[in-house]
């Protein structure tokens, strides 16, 4: 950017908005060398259709990235532009470069496979539809080359023969040299075989040169050692050199053959490389957007009456500084611009964030054009801007030896020249053709009209902004001129905004306020910076009462704005609390309804059981009367029994309402574990609950749990015991006490070391065998807990299992699950 006179105003705007810095940040998220280069030199497209396609590609790659099983990476894809260019010039490709080509083919083939396996990636399927990954070329390269890039013997029979010959000659040379070392060891400085160039030599003492005839190829720095090729191996050395030349010739022939194959598919390789770069860029856009916490923009088309909505918008470069370089936290701004607004005048003190607001808006408009997401809260709604044109800063003025005012005017002239000629309403659907919509431009003006006499500068700024209001653009301008604040009340296409100033701390808050013009606060800032108070007071006197009254009115509006914002925040908080309360009440009502249904079901079961018992008793009486000879005594007994049954049924009353009962989704406490857990299933009949405790799922008796506020589960009331029945038969034998559960080999399954499938198969068999015992101990061990979870998941759905729980600590604890059978 050293010679800005050669740049268009759109290109110069990229520099003013620090677009190259953002591109550099984006490049750090790429995975290929060409992707990084493309990201660093990324330019926004000039057509809306291209931006729409880029955004769709970003969203498609995001869906791939969000899939946990996707094999989406760019390993193996290299920058092969140099070897491709050399091949086009008739040059030779090296072995390592050929391997890079093969790796690139394999990498792109893998990416294409991921895309083709999905039905929802039409935009990417279209992108890779014409890509040829050339498996034949890849196979030929791997057949001819080893992993180190050297030509392999399998590449040709001739090469294999040459290398066998080389091996034989080397062995002959080694054998002869070993014999010389053994015979003339006194002449050697060291008993080693070394090389000088491509010749084998021995280190000979200088004084023994005459005893070792041969060719001297080198000497030590001191001259005490001569490196001599003994005469006995000179001829073999010549044969070795000749064989090496033959090997080199054959290797070059094979590389030439592979290079010619590359040349034949050069256009396919260049296209493949371009597509890989575009996919890498799309992936980088996704990852950079994710890092920013950004959301995709929804385009507002010309004629759309929706407002531009950018809530909690953050400057991406300041966010980078805060996160990566330890800079201050970014203060987000909110932009909501109605569709009829054409010009926004931002006023307020210096260093208050006016220029940052301009740059933020300009940068995110560029980001949207290249397919990046916007660092703002959802939903992001904004138009596609045909051009982003800015006049920010005085760099151009300094470079061209212009005054500040002249520099601004020259740049504004270029902005006006870049806008479409003629006065058109881009937001009027009657003017725009549906097939050829006129997209607006975005014009950003910093300190419009500054650098000259305030009266003339203000008049010029008003005229300029009124002219821009008639153009197909949205203009955002910062200013200190109070006259510009009044334009809103004269023309509905104008809007005011201001950067907030804290009168208490005498410092800006960097928040953007809409609808209220700002105060320059020059005197307050001067006082905060240390200017003597007497000077500040004298300036206030010179300023006059009318100006002070205006500032007081604006200050009052700002105070009312803050008060309304506080009330809105309180109302929002109250709304959130109400929603939470509503959810809690709804959950409680659902819980009560569930308990009512459960209670009714329980009562129905009790009634059915009582009816069945009564029928059985009556049947017994009838059978007794039918078996023996009727007598008055038996008839009397039967009458008494029937009366007793009738009295029992009349005495039946509805059970008491059940007290605390756990519900699905509720968190409860298990005192024996000292942990809380979440209820996933309630079995009222078995008086157990299924709970999730960390990674464990288990069944726990209700008697062993309590609510978070300490309430114990109240068991359902038992039916009144039926009085002892008067029977005609001999009295029944005394009821047996429940059997004691005893662990034996027959009711114990050890599945440690089993895979889950085998464990389930063995568990099914063991459950059937343990039916008589009524209980089954399953030893699964502790380990990672995966086998335990699988076993307990299997038990929770098995019809033979009534409940299950972890064994006591003295019986295996978390390594053993006890299943109680029906």
Curated annotation (Swiss-Prot):
Subunit note: Homodimer. Binds to stalled ribosomes, contacting rRNA.
Binding site residues for ATP: 348-355
UniProt KW keywords: ATP-binding, DNA-binding, Endonuclease, Hydrolase, Nuclease, Nucleotide-binding, RNA-binding, rRNA-binding
This enzyme's EC code(s): 3.1.-.-, 3.6.4.-
Domain Smr residue range list: 749-822
Function: Endonuclease that is involved in the suppression of homologous recombination and thus may have a key role in the control of bacterial genetic diversity. Acts as a ribosome collision sensor, splitting the ribosome into its 2 subunits. Detects stalled/collided 70S ribosomes which it binds and splits by an ATP-hydrolysis driven conformational change. Acts upstream of the ribosome quality control system (RQC), a ribosome-associated complex that mediates the extraction of incompletely synthesized nascent chains from stalled ribosomes and their subsequent degradation. Probably generates substrates for RQC.
One GO molecular-function entry: ATP binding
Amino acid composition bias (Basic and acidic residues), ranges on this chain: 709-728
Entry's transmembrane regions: none
Organism ancestry: Bacteria, Bacillati, Cyanobacteriota, Cyanophyceae, Synechococcales
GO biological process annotation, one example: mismatch repair
Name of the protein: Endonuclease MutS2
Enzyme class, broadest EC rank: hydrolase
Keyword DNA-binding included in the entry's annotation: yes
Record InterPro entries: DNA_mismatch_repair_MutS_C (IPR000432), DNA_mismatch_repair_MutS_core (IPR007696), DNA_mismatch_repair_MutS_sf (IPR036187), MSSS (IPR046893), MutS (IPR045076), MutS2 (IPR005747), P-loop_NTPase (IPR027417), Smr_dom (IPR002625)
Record family assignment: Belongs to the DNA mismatch repair MutS family. MutS2 subfamily.
Residue ranges, annotated region (Disordered): 707-737
Superkingdom as given in the UniProt entry: Bacteria
Gene: mutS2
């Amino acid at each position: 950017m050293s010679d800005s006179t050669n740049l268009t105003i759109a290109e110069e705007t990229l520099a003013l908005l620090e677009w190259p810095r953002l591109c550099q940040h984006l490049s750090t998220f790429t995975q290929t060398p060409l992707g990084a280069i493309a990201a660093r030199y990324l330019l926004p497209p000039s057509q809306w259709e291209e931006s729409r396609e880029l955004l769709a590609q970003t969203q498609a790659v995001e869906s791939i990235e969000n899939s946990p099983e996707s094999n989406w990476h760019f390993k193996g894809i290299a920058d092969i532009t140099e070897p491709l260019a050399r091949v086009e010039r008739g040059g030779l490709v090296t072995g390592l470069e050929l391997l890079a080509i093969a790796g690139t083919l394999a990498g792109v083939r893998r990416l294409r496979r991921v895309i083709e396996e999905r039905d929802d990636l039409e935009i990417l399927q279209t992108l890779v539809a014409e890509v040829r990954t050339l498996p034949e070329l890849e196979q030929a390269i791997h057949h001819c080359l080893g992993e180190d890039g050297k030509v392999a013997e399998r590449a040709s029979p001739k090469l294999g023969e040459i290398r066998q010959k080389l091996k034989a000659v080397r062995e002959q040379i080694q054998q002869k040299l070993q014999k010389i070392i053994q015979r003339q060891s006194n002449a050697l400085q060291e008993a080693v075989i070394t090389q000088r160039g491509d010749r084998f030599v021995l280190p000979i003492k200088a004084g023994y040169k005459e005893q070792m005839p041969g060719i001297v190829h080198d000497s030590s720095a001191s001259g005490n050692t001569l490196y001599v090729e003994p005469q006995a191996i000179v001829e073999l050395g010549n044969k070795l050199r000749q064989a090496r030349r033959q090997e080199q010739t054959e290797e070059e022939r094979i590389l030439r053959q592979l290079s010619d194959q590359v040349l034949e598919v050069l256009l396919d390789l260049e296209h493949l490389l371009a597509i890989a770069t575009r996919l890498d860029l799309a992936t980088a856009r996704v990852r950079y957007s994710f890092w920013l916490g950004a959301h995709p923009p929804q385009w507002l088309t010309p004629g759309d009456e929706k407002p531009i909505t950018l809530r909690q918008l953050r400057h991406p470069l300041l966010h980078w500084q805060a996160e990566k370089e330890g800079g201050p936290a970014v203060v987000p701004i909110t932009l909501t611009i109605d569709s009829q607004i054409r010009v926004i005048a931002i006023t307020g003190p210096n260093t208050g964030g006016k220029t940052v607001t301009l740059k933020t808006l300009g940068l995110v408009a560029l980001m949207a054009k290249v397919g990046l997401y916007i660092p703002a809260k959802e939903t992001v709604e904004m138009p596609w801007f045909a051009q982003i044109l800015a006049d920010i800063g005085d760099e151009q003025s300094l470079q061209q030896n212009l005054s500040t005012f002249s520099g601004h005017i020259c740049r504004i002239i270029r902005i006006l020249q870049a806008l479409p000629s003629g006065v058109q309403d881009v937001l009027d659907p009657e003017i725009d053709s549906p097939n050829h919509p006129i997209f607006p431009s975005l014009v950003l003006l910093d300190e419009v009209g500054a650098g000259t006499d305030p009266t003339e500068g203000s008049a010029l700024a008003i005229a300029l902004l009124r002219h821009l209001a008639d153009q197909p653009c949205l203009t955002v301008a910062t200013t200190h001129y109070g006259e510009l604040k009044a334009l809103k009340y004269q023309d509905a296409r104008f809007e005011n905004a201001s950067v907030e100033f804290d009168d208490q701390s005498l410092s800006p808050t960097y928040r953007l306020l809409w609808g209220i013009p700002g105060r320059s606060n020059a005197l307050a800032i001067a006082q905060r910076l240390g200017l003597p108070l007497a000077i500040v007071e004298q300036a206030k006197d010179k300023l006059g009462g009318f100006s002070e009254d205006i500032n007081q009115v604006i200050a009052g509006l700002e105070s009312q704005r803050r008060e309304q914002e506080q009330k809105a925040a309180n109302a929002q908080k109250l709304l959130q609390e109400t929603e939470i309360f509503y959810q809690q009440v709804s959950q409680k009502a659902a819980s009560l309804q569930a308990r009512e249904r459960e209670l009714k079901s329980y009562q129905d079961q009790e009634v059915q059981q009582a009816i069945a018992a009564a029928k059985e008793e009556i049947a017994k009486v009838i059978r007794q009367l039918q078996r023996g000879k009727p007598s008055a005594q038996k008839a009397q007994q039967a009458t008494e029994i029937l009366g007793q049954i009738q009295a029992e049924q009349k005495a039946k009353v509805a059970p008491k309402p059940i007290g605390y009962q756990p519900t699905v989704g509720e968190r409860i406490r298990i005192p024996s574990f000292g942990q809380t857990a979440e209820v996933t299933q309630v079995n009222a009949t078995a008086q157990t609950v299924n709970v999730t405790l960390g990674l464990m799922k288990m069944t726990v008796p209700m008697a062993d749990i309590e609510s978070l506020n300490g309430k114990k589960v109240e068991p359902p009331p038992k039916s009144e015991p039926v009085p002892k029945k008067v029977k005609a038969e001999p009295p029944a034998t005394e009821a047996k006490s429940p059997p004691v559960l005893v662990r034996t080999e027959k009711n114990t399954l050890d599945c440690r070391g089993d895979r889950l499938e085998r464990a389930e198969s063995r568990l099914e068999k063991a459950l059937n065998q343990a039916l008589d015992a009524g209980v089954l101990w399953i030893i699964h061990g502790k380990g990672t807990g995966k086998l335990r979870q699988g076993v307990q998941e299997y038990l929770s759905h098995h019809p033979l299992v009534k409940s299950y729980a972890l064994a006591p600590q003295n019986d295996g604890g978390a390594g053993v699950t006890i299943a109680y059978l029906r």
